[in-house]
């Protein structure tokens, strides 16, 4: 009998707790949506029907409110729908939203102290130190290495095509291979050929990052929504295989370079400068990384590994998706494809018939195509911040309290006709001099403000190389009927459900 009473009491307490939790936004005076106990806005994610980003997109489309309360399982969060308010959160009022609110533990887990995760003064100090890594001069110095990976991409495609006629290739997988190699060479300085060796160390790490099994789902959810839980997992020694493999690879490479005085023009070399000299040299011609006289290291090997892992994971998925989605859209828009091909041809011709960094920089129409792809298919479909001090919402009586997670649906804003006329149409002209028929505050594929993606310029260069190589060496078959890409239901990045099919043939 006592057991029954205890059970009734437990159920009653649970009911009261859930009702109290899921009435949070009502008590704060905010409009709300996605009030589905116990998973809130993520109910479709738990049922395997939608990815995290697309579930938030559904919430975005369900209302016209400028800011709306929702529930990420048991955690209340705010979805910002108004473009100007989103811009203020990221830029003008950055002081009130300067952190992401995700898991980071610099002291006990240095691998977590990546530029993406770090907070406050630690983040600002590291950001300032890393900024010189991505200047035009540094990227130009790395270009020859990147270009050689583009040649391997061309060779791989050639081998798969018949001597006559076209063949359908799945571009997402192909461009993922290209992305892995270009990241491995420009970041780690390692000569990797995943086209010839699909089981190399970087490919293995990539597969472990993208497993989408129950372990990864739990760890990803805890890192994003419940940082305290992730700290507990780390404390009890629950290691993530991909992270550990990256740590080992990074440490081996650092030791090899420092012990043998090896100098290469890549991102790791710049991090070694920072480790050994306390700063990255702003002279684009100096790449050496000798230690200072006192031998003090300003950056641990684990901290270096954390940055490399971030740049690897972020750069790999963004490059692969943006490249494949752009080529897919070109096959659906023949006029756009002809302009892009001419842009590539004329830029290469202008620079002596070679694909150089300067030629890439001159491809303005191709740049506009990439910007339009990043709008329609943002690699990360959402941005997140956390309120770091109480913030009165402009033109309202609402106050966002410190500690509140903030979500901005990029795919929501980017496909909102209020901000982008005819949002599903692929129009690179939006970004050319006579375009600009869109709300600029709503265009956020690389983020905005002080925490804007630090590697955006490098990413665009890598995407341009791949597209320029493909357009210069192959013919792409125009699709007879336009077809929108369906997205997968796992992970946060925007992933195609069934790949990105494009028919190619050898250039006549």
Swiss-Prot record:
Keywords for this protein:
Endoplasmic reticulum, Heme, Iron, Membrane, Metal-binding, Microsome, Monooxygenase, Oxidoreductase
Task: List the gene name.
Answer: Cyp6d5
Q: What is its EC number?
A: 1.14.-.-
CDD domains per UniProt: CYP6-like
Q: Which cofactor does it need?
A: heme
**Would you tell me the protein name for this molecule?**
Probable cytochrome P450 6d5
GO function term, MF aspect, one: monooxygenase activity
Q: Which domain of life is it from?
A: Eukaryota
> A single Pfam family, by name?
p450
């Amino acid at each position: 009998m006592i057991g029954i009473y205890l059970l009734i009491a437990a159920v009653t307490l649970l009911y009261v707790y859930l009702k109290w939790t899921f009435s949070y936004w009502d008590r704060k005076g905010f409009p709300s949506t996605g009030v589905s106990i116990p998973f809130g806005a993520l109910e479709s994610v738990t049922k395997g029907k939608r990815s995290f980003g697309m579930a938030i997109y559904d919430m975005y489309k369900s209302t016209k409110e400028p800011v709306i309360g929702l529930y990420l399982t048991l955690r209340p969060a705010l979805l910002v729908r108004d473009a100007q308010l989103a811009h203020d959160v990221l830029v003008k009022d950055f002081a009130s939203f300067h952190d992401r609110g995700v898991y980071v533990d610099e002291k006990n887990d240095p691998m977590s102290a990546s530029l993406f995760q770090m907070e406050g003064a630690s983040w600002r100090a590291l950001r300032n130190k890393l900024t010189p890594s991505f200047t035009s001069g540094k990227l130009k110095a790395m270009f020859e290495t990147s270009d050689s990976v583009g040649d391997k991409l061309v060779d791989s495609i050639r081998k798969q095509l018949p001597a006559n006629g076209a063949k359908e290739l799945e571009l997402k997988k192909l461009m993922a291979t290209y992305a892995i190699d270009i990241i491995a060479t420009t970041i780690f300085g390692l000569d990797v050929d995943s086209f010839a060796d699909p089981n190399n160390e970087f490919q293995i790490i990539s597969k472990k990052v993208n497993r989408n099994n129950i372990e990864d789902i739990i760890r990803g959810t805890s890192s994003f929504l419940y940082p305290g839980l992730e700290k507990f997992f780390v404390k009890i020694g629950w290691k993530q295989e991909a992270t550990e493999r990256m740590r080992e690879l990074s440490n081996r490479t650092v030791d090899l370079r420092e012990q043998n005085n090896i100098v290469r023009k890549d991102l790791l070399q710049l991090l070694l400068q920072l480790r050994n000299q306390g700063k990255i040299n702003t002279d684009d011609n100096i790449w050496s990384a000798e230690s200072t006289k006192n031998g003090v290291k300003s950056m641990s090997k684990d901290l270096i590994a954390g940055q490399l892992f971030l740049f690897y994971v972020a750069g790999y998925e963004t490059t692969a998706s943006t490249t494949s989605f752009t080529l897919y859209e070109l096959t659906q828009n023949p006029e756009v494809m002809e302009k892009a091909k001419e842009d590539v041809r004329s830029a290469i011709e202008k620079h002596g018939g070679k694909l150089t960094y300067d030629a890439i920089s001159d491809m303005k129409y191709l740049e506009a195509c990439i910007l339009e792809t990043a709008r329609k298919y943002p690699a990360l479909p959402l941005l997140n911040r956390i309120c770091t001090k109480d913030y009165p919402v402009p033109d309202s009586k609402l106050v966002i309290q410190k500690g509140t997670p903030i979500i901005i649906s990029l795919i929501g804003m980017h496909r909102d006709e209020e901000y982008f006329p005819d949002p599903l149409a692929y129009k690179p002209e939006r970004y050319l001099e006579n375009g600009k028929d869109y709300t600029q505050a709503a265009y956020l594929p690389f983020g905005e403000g002080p925490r804007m993606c630090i590697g955006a310029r490098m990413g665009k260069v890598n995407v341009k190389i791949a597209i320029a190589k493909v357009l210069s060496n192959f013919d792409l078959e125009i699709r007879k009927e336009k077809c929108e890409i369906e997205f997968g239901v796992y992970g946060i990045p925007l992933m195609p459900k069934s790949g990105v099919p494009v028919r190619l043939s050898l250039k006549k």
